[in-house]
Each structure stands twice: as C-alpha cells, then as structure tokens.
From Swiss-Prot:
The protein, known as: Ribosomal RNA processing protein 1 homolog B
Modified residues (Phosphothreonine): 694
Subunit: Interacts with the transcriptional activator E2F1. Interacts with serine/threonine-protein phosphatase PP1 subunits PPP1CB and PPP1CC but not with PPP1CA. Interacts with 60S ribosomal proteins RPL5 and RPL27, ribosomal processing protein RRP1/NNP1 and other nucleolar proteins including NOP2/NOL1 and FBL. Also interacts with nucleolar protein NPM1/B23. Interacts with splicing factor SRSF1 and LUC7L3/CROP. Interacts with GTPase activator SIPA1. Interacts with H1-10, NCL, PARP1, TRIM28 and YBX3.
Region called Disordered, residue ranges: 331-576, 625-649, 687-724
Parts forming coiled coils: none
Main location: nucleus
Entry superkingdom: Eukaryota
MF terms in GO: transcription coactivator activity
Similarity annotation: Belongs to the RRP1 family.
Length: 724
C-alpha cells in the first residue's frame, strides 16, 4: 500500500540507486519509456521537483557503477535521455535540473568518483548542443540555453562550485567545435561566447577571470593559426546569394580547406606546441570554429569600457583586445602576457634542439672562439686518442735532430708546456751518437695543436719523471767519462726548471727525496730506444700500465713499486708507461748516475698505535683503610679491586647435593601461615581476601613498638676520605 501511494518518480529514484546492476538497467529502460510517454501530449509535462527526483536517482545510478567501460556506456545512455523528451520546453527544464543536481551533489563527490562525473558533464553539454543543432541553431533557442548556463553556473549568484564552473569553461569550446564547427558562422559563435564576455567583465573573482581568459579567448587566439585564410565577408556573400544549399556547399569547401591548412601547419612545424595540440584536437573533432576577430575585439572593448568593470578585469580584457586586433590586422598574437610564458619556453627548447643539431658541424676555430666550451663527443674522442695513439704513426716517428747548444734552453722551454713528446735534451755524447746517423733522413715528429685538459697535467708530469729515471746502460757508462761536461749543462738547465721540479715533488711526494738513491736497471740487455732497420731510433709504443708482481729492485716507472708510497687519490689519476724508455736531461742523468742501491727499503704502512704489553699504571702511594685486618695486596691490580671484606672464602659441597621429594608433612609447609592447607598445587584453593582488603593481622592494627637502637655500630664500607 505504501508503494502504491508513492509517486512514480520516487520509485524510479529508488530503483536507479539500487546496488544490483540488473535492477538499475531495467529502471533506466523503463525511465526512457516513461519520459517519452509522459511528454507526448501537450498537457502532460514534468514539474521541476519531479525532474529533480529523477536526476537524483540518475546521479546515484552513476555513483554505484564502478567499471570504466560501463561508466562510459551509462553516461552515454543518461545524456541521450534529453532527446527522448518530446516537448522542447521540457528538454530545457531537463537540462536545467541536471545542472541544479550537480551543484547540489558536487561537494559530496570524492576523488575516486570525480572522473565519471566530469565525463557526464561533458556528454550532457554535447547533447545540449545537439538539441540546438536539431533546431537549426535558432537564435531564440540559443538565448534560452545561454540563460540557463548563466543562471545556474556562470553567475556569481548561482553559488555554483568552482569544479563545475571550471570544467564547463574548459570543455565548452571543444564540445561546440565537435557539434557545430562545420555549420556555425562567426556571428553565431560570437553569441555563443557572449556569456563568458559578460562574466569576465563583472565578476570579482580574479581566478574566474583568468580561467575564462585562458579557457575561451586564449583558445580562440591559439586556433587562429589553424584557420584557413578565408574572410568573413566571403562567407556572408555566399550566405546571402542563395539559401541553405549554398551554405552547405561553402561549409564543405571550408572543411576541406581547413583540413589542408591543418595538415600544412602540422607538417611545417611553424606553430608552437600548444597550438599544435589544439590543431590536432580540432583536426580530430572536425573543422575549427569561425570567428570575426574584429567583432570579438569590439565586444571585449565595449564591456571593458563599462564603469562597473573592476580594474583587474579591465586590464586583462585590454590585453585580449590587443591580441584580437593584431589578429584582425593579419599579425600574430603578441606574446607579452604572463600566460604565454609556456609558449616562450617551448620556443626556447626548439631553438636549443636546432643549435644542438648544428653543433656537430661547427669548425674547431668556432669552438676556440666560443670560450673553451668543447662538445662532449669531441672530449671523449680526444681522451681516447690521448691514451691510444695511432700505431702506424708511432712506428714511423723518430727522435728529431737536436739543435745547437745555444738554442737548448729555448727548446726545453717550448717542449715543457707542450706535453705531446716527453723527450728532454740529450747529453753531449748522445748528441754525437745521433750525429753519426745524421746523413740518413729522419722524419720529424708531428706536433699536434690540440688543447689539453687541465686534469691531464699530473699524468704528463709523472710520465716525464718516470721516463727520465730509466736510462740505457750505454749512456750510463759514457756519462761517467764526461761527468764534468754533463754537470755544467745540468746546472744550466736545472735553474730554468727548478720551479717545475718543486711542483712535481709536491705532487709526487711519495717518491724518494733524492733522486740519487734510486737504483739503476742492471740487466743484460740494455733498455735503449728501439732501432729500426735503417738505423733510425724510434719511440716505443705507449701502453697502459698493468699490475706486476713485486720485485726485489725498485723500478721508478713500475707502478707496483710505488703502490705503498703513493696515496689513494693519486693512484686513481696516474697511469704510467710500463715499457716506454726515453732519454733524459743531463741534470737527471747526473743525479741518477751512481749505481748505489737504496739505503732504506720502502716500508709498508704500520698501525698508527701498537701496544705489545698491557700497561697498568702504578699508584703513587697506598693508604690502608682503618679498622681493617686485611693484608695489603701484592700486585697493583689487587690494590684497585680488593677491599677488606673480599677475603671471605665460600666453598660448595657438591657431593651433598640431593633432590628432596615433596611431602605434605614437610616442615617448610608447617612453617607457612596456612599450615596443612598449603600444598604444591590446589586447583580449588581461593584467596583469603581481595587485593584491596588487608588481613586481620595487618600492620596497621598492631601497635608500634619503640625503635631499638643497635648495640654496636654496623660495619660500614670504606669511603674515599678514609684513604687520605
């Protein structure tokens, strides 16, 4: 009886909000039939309260639907209910009650349910434009629809939630382009965006003004790059010439022209990323909307000049007016506003990408002029070429001829910063030995003008020192004969290279202080430079250092001998030549000329502190405690640990340890206060009194006896004052 008295709209709302999907599906099908049958007659129509009940049931029908595909299907079915209503007046009331329901229920939607209602708003707005399209975009129908949006959503008096209002502004032009992009004219489009012009002029919410400017007017400016060059006057002349067929033909031509322009814009890449996204969206949805930019600028200027327009709104509208005026004149939209920072950022990124593509073909001279910025790829190539030189060129390279003795200091100074060839000036005997083969042509060592990175200086300095320490046996024997001449030349060169030698000693502090203490190789085969078939001395091939086993003699160029002496930080950066042997300057030859061995071998690192025996400090004096009969301990450890009471001795008779059986007549049980009733385990035993209650013989009931003083003072522990 209760269900029979309820209205049909209430019953529909209950069944639409059911937790069972079958009940909801049947309710939606019956609602579709009910709306069609109720609005067929002219007299039969819905009231606002009845449609609010139906929309509330549809809202919760969408709420309980969880699967995404089923949500999209249900949103399509709900939005299609507008076309089931036969009365035009009931259709707009159906749309109005939808927006009222969304405003009322929006605050209770959580994040998980938000996307489905965004989709429902978009689809209902699209079907609302479909209603206008079926009515041939009549001006009266457009006015009625825009009044509903202005009253329920955009107006400040509507108190619509910001989420509903913002989402409507975001999807308005997109859905309008999807439905009427091929049919709407510039005047109709200007009328459809007129509510946003009014709300941008009179609202006091700065966020809403920015949202309208970005979501509506900035989109129109951005899509201007995708609109073909067809004037509004031509469209008007086509419309005035004849009726609908000419308009349809013009629309078809416009669609084809717009698609071609879109393809050209996207292919040439002349537009920004934001415009590209808008053009791609418009290409998928159809042809873009046509706007008369001069009419839009005039409308915005009119509302901006109103006295009731706030200053912030007027300033924002004036920037939009300048953009539309520039579009009307044929120029691109200026990028002076703060909203165009994103486009500037994208243009900078495109410019950087183009520069990086062109950077691969830049000449070396341009690299030097750019302030020392070298490309990463070229750095890697230079690094590989530094450690892995060409084998063919090294085989053909020979030691160059030595100039006169007058030019020796100059050549030494030029070769020192170069770092390409680590060859120093030879001795007088070495010059004579090379002069014997001067009749044969010797190829000149090529000098590369590549700039070296600063972090390679340690490596090159260490190579020069290592190569100077390994000398041929023949030169060492000859050096003893002409020691006087070599000492004079060494003194001349050492004065110019004194500063560099000090720096090398600082960097390689692990090497011995005096170079004379280093041993000289005394093998059977001399380690002289490699001689070719023609008698030309060639440089050996550079190889990377490899780990070697420890030997009895110390090789200055062997990295394994210097391993315990070189710090960890320098071991990572220094890579030495293992087989390369070059000639050295006379100063270094004289310093290394002696055949003495090292006085002290290099020691491995010991512990910082090492204690062989345990150290126990001895006290300065010892004072015996008063009234103590204990003897003085013998050792110092006994003085610190033992006290007079520590002389007691306790013994345990383990042979008398026996386990006793439990007996009820045990004397320990008889001594207990409960007597025979106390057993080992009695499950039926209960406590005599509670926790908060006291026994009859409580200490409070017994009289206090006078405190007795002890006859003798107890023996106390010694204090610190007893020892001093």
């Amino acid at each position: 009886m209760a269900l029979a008295m309820q209205s049909s709209e209430f019953q529909f709302a209950q069944r639409l909000a059911s937790s069972e999907k079958g009940v909801r599906d049947r309710a939606v099908r019956k609602l579709r039939q009910y709306l069609s049958a109720r609005t067929q007659s002219d007299t039969g129509s819905f009231s606002q309260e009845e449609l609010l009940k139906i929309w509330k049931g549809l809202f919760y029908c969408m709420w309980v639907q969880d699967e995404p595909l089923l949500q999209e299907e249900l949103a399509n079915i709900i939005s299609q209910l507008i076309h089931v209503v036969n009365s035009l007046e009931a259709q707009y009331l159906f749309i109005q009650t939808f927006w009222q329901t969304m405003n009322r229920e929006w605050q209770g939607i959580d994040k998980l349910q938000l996307d489905k209602y965004y989709m429902l708003i978009r689809l209902v707005l699209r079907q609302s434009f479909e209603v206008l399209k079926r009515n041939a975009w009549e001006e009266s129908q457009i006015t009625l629809f825009l009044d509903i949006l202005m009253k329920e959503i955009l107006s400040p008096e509507s108190q619509s939630p910001n989420g509903v209002r913002t989402h409507l502004i975001d999807v308005y032009l997109e859905e309008l382009t999807t439905v009427g992009g091929a049919e709407l004219l510039a005047d109709q489009n200007l009328k459809l965006i007129d509510p946003f012009c009014r709300i941008a002029a009179k609202t006091k919410d700065h966020t809403l003004v920015q949202t309208v400017a970005r979501g509506v007017f900035e989109v129109i400016v951005d899509q201007s790059a995708c609109v073909p060059q067809e004037s509004v006057e031509e469209r008007k002349t086509k419309e005035d010439g004849s009726g609908f067929p000419t308009k349809a033909l013009a629309c078809r031509k416009a669609v084809s022209g717009k698609k071609a322009a879109l393809d050209e814009c996207l292919r040439d890449g002349v537009i920004g990323s934001r415009e590209r996204d808008i053009c791609a969206a418009l290409k998928d949805s159809g042809s873009p909307l046509q706007f008369d930019y001069k009419a839009v600028a005039d409308r915005l200027l009119e509302i901006a000049n109103s006295k009731s327009t706030p200053p912030f709104n007027r300033k924002r509208l004036c920037r939009l007016v300048r953009k539309f005026q520039d579009l009307c004149e044929g120029n691109g939209a200026p990028l002076s506003s703060a909203e165009d920072n994103g486009q500037r950022r994208h243009k900078r990124k495109r410019k950087k990408l183009l520069e990086s593509e062109k950077g691969d073909t830049v000449s070396p001279a341009a690299e030097e002029d750019s302030g020392g910025h070298i490309h990463k790829k070229k750095r890697k190539k230079r690094k590989r070429s530094h450690f892995q030189p060409d084998t063919q060129n090294l085989d053909a390279v020979a030691v160059p001829k030595v100039p006169d003795s007058e030019s020796e200091p100059d050549t030494a100074q030029r070769q020192a910063p170069c770092g390409q060839a680590c060859v120093t000036e030879p001795t007088a005997e070495a010059v004579s030995s090379i002069g014997e083969n001067s009749s044969k042509p010797t190829p000149v060592m090529p000098i590369h003008n590549k700039r070296k990175r600063p972090r390679k200086k340690k490596l090159r300095a260490h190579k020069e020192i290592c190569k100077s320490t390994t000398l041929p046996q023949e030169d060492m024997s000859k050096n003893d004969a002409v020691s006087g001449h070599s000492q004079s030349s060494a003194a001349h060169i050492s004065s110019s290279e004194g500063v560099q030698a000090q720096k090398r000693k600082r960097k390689l502090g692990a090497l011995p202080d005096s170079s004379s203490d280093l041993p000289v190789q005394k093998s059977g085969t001399p380690t002289s430079p490699v001689e070719g078939k023609d008698g030309q001395t060639t440089l050996p091939r550079c190889k990377r250092s490899q780990k070697k086993t420890a030997s009895s003699t110390l090789d200055p160029c062997d990295p394994s001998s210097q391993k315990p002496a070189i710090s960890k930080k320098k071991k990572k950066t220094m890579k030495l030549m293992s087989n390369g042997v070059l000639e050295s300057n006379p100063g270094q030859i004289q310093a290394l000329g002696s055949n003495r061995t090292l006085k002290k071998p290099l020691k491995t690192e010991d512990d910082f502190v090492k204690f062989d025996t345990r150290f126990l400090p001895k006290p300065l004096f010892f004072r015996k405690a008063k009234n103590s009969s204990a003897t003085r301990p013998q050792g110092p450890a006994g003085q610190l640990n033992k006290t007079p009471s520590s002389s007691k001795k306790v013994t345990f008779g383990l042979n008398r340890n026996m386990t006793a059986e439990f007996k009820k007549t045990d004397k320990s049980i008889l001594v207990s206060p409960t007597g025979l009733s106390r057993v080992a385990f009695n499950p039926e035993q209960r406590p005599l009194h509670g926790v908060l209650k006291t026994a009859t013989s409580s200490p409070a009931s017994t009289p206090l006896s006078p405190m007795r003083l002890p006859a003798t003072t107890p023996k106390r522990r010694p204090r610190a004052a007893d020892f001093f």
